[in-house]
Amino acid sequence: MSHKVTKAHNGATLTVAVGELVEIQLPSNPTTGFAWYFEGGTKESPNESMFTVENKYFPPDSKLLGAGGTEHFHVTVKAAGTHAVNLTYMRPWTGPSHDSERFTVYLKAN
């Protein structure tokens, strides 16, 4: 079984099984330089012993120049416990600021 998580789930706690896939889908527009990153400006899991991450960007169906698409993070929980997945929408060369958009979902793995 897998779980689909969107921006509407910000701050939510999901109960998942160890080894289960959670797909986080967030609006993104890399043509502006912005994308979703973990703390430290990385696309990789900040804690590989707790969960692994694969990341992919899907462009929009629109032909409009500069239209945003969707960034997908496939998160697989590797250990029991509650794990926070924290993402920040930012430009990697400037880092997060006080007004950066943030997304957090808590994965409670049994």
From Swiss-Prot:
Motif BC loop, residue numbers: 29-34
Keyword Disulfide bond: no
An annotated GO cellular component: cell surface
GO molecular function, one term: cysteine-type endopeptidase inhibitor activity
Record motif DE loop, residues: 59-68
Subcellular location per the Swiss-Prot or TrEMBL entry: Flagellar pocket; Cytoplasmic vesicle; Cell surface
Record carries keyword Nucleotidyltransferase: no
Record function comment: Cysteine protease inhibitor. Inhibits cysteine protease cruzipain.
Domain notes: The BC, DE and FG loops form a tripartite wedge that blocks the substrate-binding site of target cysteine proteases. The BC loop interacts with the catalytically active cysteine and histidine residues of the protease catalytic center.
UniProt protein name: Chagasin
Organism the protein comes from: Trypanosoma cruzi
Taxonomic placement: Eukaryota, Discoba, Euglenozoa, Kinetoplastea, Metakinetoplastina
Encoding gene, per UniProt annotation: cha
